[in-house]
């Protein structure tokens, strides 16, 4: 990955749910990125762990357009698992590799402020504002931020409503990358690349083409928030990519060699 002299060297990385798997190499790649002088900012999800604990507690998992309906009881599980268990497992793994890391959530220092999307999906929300003060302070102290997408419910909050929100980690990653004007936004997923209308893998797409994939319905499911977040980041001057995190060392390969999945830029389309 080439850095310009004006680069802030910030790379925002959205970690998929496999990062705690002993065979996953993504966290090991973080150590290499630090050695290369980059400043990784990690955002994680943990939907499968939330679902597993919900089942243990006898709570039904309900999804609308692939996102979790978040009632009071589910919000408790989301906050405990994402801002607690999953976040601290990742931080502990990084510390074990000699990387100074700190786990925070969107609530801390009002890093992510949001509002409820719709009454029928409960405390499922959308990002309204990003405050980068805490993230920047950690980076300046050479500490890697590990961010849970549990966020602060302040905007248009009804009287008596909860102060926490469950926000999808994909848009959180895009908004943070945009606010930080990061050099790169990387999504580690369980697919090799974004697919075109004929099912072909797309190696590089322009922002306009990404928007067409969304508007036409070619992009579906979990790819929708990822592509939207890539568009958000490119508008702020970042480049963005979606790569297969299941393959060993794909993160470091993408950032040093490139061409590992789908890159969203303002340039011409290249198919792989």
Swiss-Prot record:
Keyword Transmembrane helix: no
Catalytic activity: N-acetyl-L-glutamate + ATP = N-acetyl-L-glutamyl 5-phosphate + ADP
MF terms (GO), sorted A to Z: acetylglutamate kinase activity; ATP binding
GO biological process: arginine biosynthetic process via ornithine; L-arginine biosynthetic process
Keyword annotations: Amino-acid biosynthesis, Arginine biosynthesis, ATP-binding, Cytoplasm, Kinase, Nucleotide-binding, Transferase
Class of this enzyme: transferase
Pfam families reported for this sequence: AA_kinase
Principal subcellular localization: cytoplasm
Superkingdom assignment: Bacteria
Site positions per UniProt: Transition state stabilizer: 14, 226
Subcellular location: Cytoplasm
Segment forming the signal sequence: none
This enzyme's EC code(s): 2.7.2.8
CC terms in the record's Gene Ontology section: cytoplasm
Pathway listed: Amino-acid biosynthesis; L-arginine biosynthesis; N(2)-acetyl-L-ornithine from L-glutamate: step 2/4
UniProt: substrate binding residues: 46-47, 68, 166
Family the UniProt entry places it in: Belongs to the acetylglutamate kinase family. ArgB subfamily.
PANTHER family for this protein: N-ACETYLGLUTAMATE SYNTHASE (PTHR23342), N-ACETYLGLUTAMATE SYNTHASE, MITOCHONDRIAL (PTHR23342:SF0)
Function of the molecule: Catalyzes the ATP-dependent phosphorylation of N-acetyl-L-glutamate.
Protein name, UniProt field: Acetylglutamate kinase
Record organism: Dehalococcoides mccartyi (strain CBDB1)
Lineage: Bacteria, Bacillati, Chloroflexota, Dehalococcoidia, Dehalococcoidales
């Amino acid at each position: 990955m080439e850095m310009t002299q004006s680069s802030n060297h910030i790379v925002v990385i959205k970690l998929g749910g496999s990062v705690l798997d002993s065979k996953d190499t993504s966290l090991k790649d973080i150590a290499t990125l630090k050695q290369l002088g980059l400043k990784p900012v990690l955002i994680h999800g943990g939907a499968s762990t939330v679902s597993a604990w919900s089942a243990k507690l006898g709570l039904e998992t309900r999804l609308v357009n692939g996102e979790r309906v978040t009632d009071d009881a589910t919000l408790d599980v989301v906050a405990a698992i994402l801002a607690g268990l999953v976040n601290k497992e990742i931080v502990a793994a990084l510390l074990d590799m000699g990387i100074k890391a700190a786990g925070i959530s969107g609530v801390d220092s009002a890093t992510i402020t949001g509002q409820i999307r719709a009454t029928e999906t409960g405390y499922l929300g959308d990002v309204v504002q990003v405050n980068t003060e805490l993230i920047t302070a950690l980076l300046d102290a050479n500490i890697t931020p590990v961010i849970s997408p549990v966020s602060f419910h302040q905007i248009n909050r009804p009287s008596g409503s909860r102060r926490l929100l469950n926000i999808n980690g994909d848009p959180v990653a895009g908004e943070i990358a945009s606010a930080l004007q990061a050099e790169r936004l990387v999504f580690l997923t369980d697919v090799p690349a974004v697919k075109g209308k004929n099912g072909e893998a797309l190696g590089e797409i322009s922002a306009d083409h990404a928007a067409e994939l969304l508007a036409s319905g070619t992009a579906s499911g979990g790819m929708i928030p990822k592509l939207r977040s890539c568009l958000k980041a490119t508008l702020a001057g970042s480049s963005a990519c979606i790569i297969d995190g299941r393959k060993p060392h794909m993160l470091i390969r993408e950032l040093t060699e490139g061409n590992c999945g789908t890159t969203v830029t303002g340039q011409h389309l290249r198919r792989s």
